[in-house]
Regions:
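Exposed, interaction-prone extracellular/peripheral surfaces
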Residues: 1-30, 37-228
Length: 228
């Protein structure tokens, strides 16, 4: 059955972070590109919402290369606008909910909705929007995370903040390490708890590893053999 797809790609400042290989924003862009071309190759229509701290931009679903290129161009523009010197958006954490509300007004029934995000700021409102979407559509949540969320070094100091308020944390303090690890783990646990009521798939993708092999593993594809 041919059906349309909507890809929501998160390019907020929370995605502008990476300790190994990629920024989360880059991994999200790669996931979106791979998904868009695969969906188009199956003969389906592809559209999207590109989310940034400034808001979001919609790309209507079309069955054409031009539509995919337009979506990926918007993603590239949002990615290029990310900067450590960019001013903080106080309501950035709520932008995901606003984009999901817009998605609810776009999809009707029998759509595939792929949300590619670190789910920063996700809460009960997020779940409510996803529940409404999932009633008549298929939802996939691609959780993009950085290895540092689970691999906290035992020494050193890091500065964390939102661009306005900053604080230095001592990693030698076991309480600090536990809290940092819990932050990354809590998002995954929250999505797992949502999986059953949403009847949705969860794809945890690390920005610290190449994207394609991870997606192949998650979808159960056998590894390609090298030619002799």
């Amino acid at each position: 059955m041919v059906r349309p797809a909507l890809i929501l790609v998160d390019q907020r400042m929370s995605m502008f972070y990476g300790t190994r290989l990629n920024m989360k924003s880059v991994t999200a862009a790669e996931i979106a590109a791979l998904a868009a071309w695969r969906i188009l190759g199956a003969g389906d229509r592809v559209g999207g919402l590109v989310l940034s701290d400034a808001g979001f931009e919609a790309v209507p679903a079309r069955r054409s290369r031009a539509a995919v290129l337009r979506l990926l161009e918007r993603v590239a523009q949002a990615n290029a606008a990310l900067s450590a010197e960019a001013p903080a958006a106080p309501d950035a954490a709520f932008r995901l909910d606003a984009a999901l509300a817009r998605a609810s007004g776009i999809v009707t029934h029998d759509w595939l909705v792929l949300v590619v995000s670190d789910f920063d700021g996700a809460g009960e409102t997020t779940l409510r929007h996803l529940s409404g979407i999932s009633r008549r559509n298929d939802v996939i949540m691609a959780l993009v995370h950085d290895p540092s969320a689970h691999e906290i070094p035992e020494t050193g100091r890091i500065v964390v903040g939102d661009g306005v308020l900053q604080v230095e944390l001592d990693l030698a303090d076991s309480r600090v390490r536990r809290n940092l690890a819990a932050t990354g783990g809590d998002r995954l646990r929250r999505l797992i708890a949502w999986q059953a009521p949403l009847d949705a798939a969860i794809l945890p993708v690390s920005a610290g590893e190449p994207t394609v092999p991870q997606l192949l593993r998650l979808f159960g594809a056998p590894p390609r053999r090298r030619s002799a």
